[in-house]
Regions:
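C-terminal nucleotide
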Residues: 1-126, 138-180
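Glycine-rich active-site/cofactor-binding loop and its immediate structural neighborhood
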Residues: 134
């Protein structure tokens, strides 16, 4: 889809609505987000199966509804020019801690240690991207603490990125030989 979008899911499918952020705020948010590859890989289907076991559905639904209720708050922080963008980082921290309670495989001791290290280095919040168990860890950090965070996470691959308005596209294609 490209750009910033809010995706609302319902029983009929989903609805994609653009979130309009000023270029200045978007640039600031991009600068304040720092992403790292954890080096841990996993199959998201395995994580989902493990997370579906255990806790009662009623309890999980309650937590997921709380997470969903925070979407409006996050959107408001991003859109309103007078809101403190650092609140987005704090909200990431809160929602990550909430997400961790939704399944035993969302996080691991190693990921928890990396997250703690990031917070101790000055990040206001962060989250693991995807189903959990590994992959990419993203942090929100104030500019004055950005290099501290990068230094603290020096054992991980720092992955610089920029927000994209155009959506998914192929940027490199290498033809392969297929026997058919």
């Amino acid at each position: 889809f490209g750009g910033f979008n809010r995706i609302d899911f319902n029983e009929d499918g989903y609805k994609v609505s653009p979130v309009i952020i000023s270029p200045e705020r978007k640039s600031m948010l991009n600068y304040n987000l720092v992403m790292f590859f954890t080096g841990f890989t996993r199959f998201s289907s395995d994580i989902q199966k493990a997370n579906n076991a255990g806790e009662s559905n009623e309890n999980k639904i309650k937590k997921l509804k709380e997470m969903y209720s925070l979407v409006d708050e996050a959107e408001k922080i991003l859109v309103e020019k007078n809101s403190d963008l650092d609140e987005f980082g704090r909200l990431l921290d809160y929602t990550w801690k909430l997400k961790r309670t939704t399944g035993e495989k969302v996080s691991t001791e190693s990921i928890d240690a990396l997250y703690k290290k990031g917070i101790e280095a000055g990040a206001l919040g962060g989250k693991l991207l995807g189903a959990g168990g590994g992959g990419f860890l993203i942090f929100y950090v104030k500019p004055e603490n950005k290099q501290n965070l990068i230094n603290a996470m020096s054992g991980l691959l720092h992955v610089p990125f920029e927000f994209e308005n155009g959506g998914s596209r192929i940027i490199q294609y290498t033809a392969e030989d297929y026997e058919g």
